[in-house]
UniProtKB/Swiss-Prot annotation:
This is Thiamine-phosphate synthase. One of its GO terms (molecular function) is magnesium ion binding. Pathway: Cofactor biosynthesis; thiamine diphosphate biosynthesis; thiamine phosphate from 4-amino-2-methyl-5-diphosphomethylpyrimidine and 4-methyl-5-(2-phosphoethyl)-thiazole: step 1/1. The keyword Hydrolase does not apply.
Length: 212
């Protein structure tokens, strides 16, 4: 799939480790897809995450659901899985191997890479084949146990000024700070708990759409 930066507008990330069980995962994903997310990243990582055949079987269900709603699907740091289920994109962190090697294996997948500061961005800025950058954490987050120190709105703004890639902000983004993030002119925001722990996903996403 050809990447378009408008995909980054309302980016939802989730794995089974973020919710009670697989049934809850699928219920939340279905609601989020119906309610207007523009991109979904399947991220199984951390304590309690699925592996092997269980991960593959759930990923196939995720692929079917995202295809039904015409929402692009990104796989986090699992190239074999991304190709096996015909995902649309792949995402890598700073510790997920060399970007050049990952891009060589990506085929027709679009590629996202995480950075948390200007130095990390400058190291990958001129690597061909990167379609967008995930910048963060913007705020403190409990969704990722290995999260780096938050860079704040000022850190995000600085990266937006120097970057020549589309940027999606991530990390600790909730309804009460979303407007501050969007005011930087960033291409989109990526969230986990803002949707996965929402008591009303449809209302949460309607509010998000109204701010953009």
């Amino acid at each position: 799939m050809i990447f378009d930066k408008t995909m980054l507008a309302r980016y939802f990330i989730m794995g089974t480790q973020d919710v009670a069980d697989e049934a809850e995962f699928l219920r939340i994903l279905n609601q989020a897809l119906r309610s207007g997310i523009t991109l979904f990243q399947y991220r199984e990582k951390g304590q309690g995450a699925l592996v092997g055949q269980k991960k593959l079987q759930l990923a196939k269900q995720v692929r079917a659901l995202t295809a039904q709603y015409h929402v692009p699907l990104v796989i986090d740091d699992d190239m074999a899985l991304a190709h096996a289920i015909a995902a649309d994109g792949i995402h890598f962190g700073q510790d997920d191997g060399r970007p050049v090697d990952n891009i060589k294996q990506s085929g027709n997948l679009f590629v996202g890479v995480s950075v948390s500061n200007q130095q990390e961005y400058q190291r990958i800025a001129h690597v061909a084949g990167i379609d967008h950058i995930g910048v963060g954490p913007i705020f403190a987050t409990t969704s990722k146990s290995d999260a780096k120190p938050p860079i704040g709105i000022s850190g995000l703004s600085q990266l937006i000024r120097i970057a020549h890639h589309p940027i999606v902000a991530i990390g600790g983004i909730q309804r009460d700070n979303l407007s501050k993030v969007l005011s930087t002119g960033v291409d989109g925001a990526a969230v986990i708990s803002m949707i996965s722990q929402s008591g009303d996903i449809q209302k949460t996403l309607a509010d998000w759409r109204n701010r953009t």
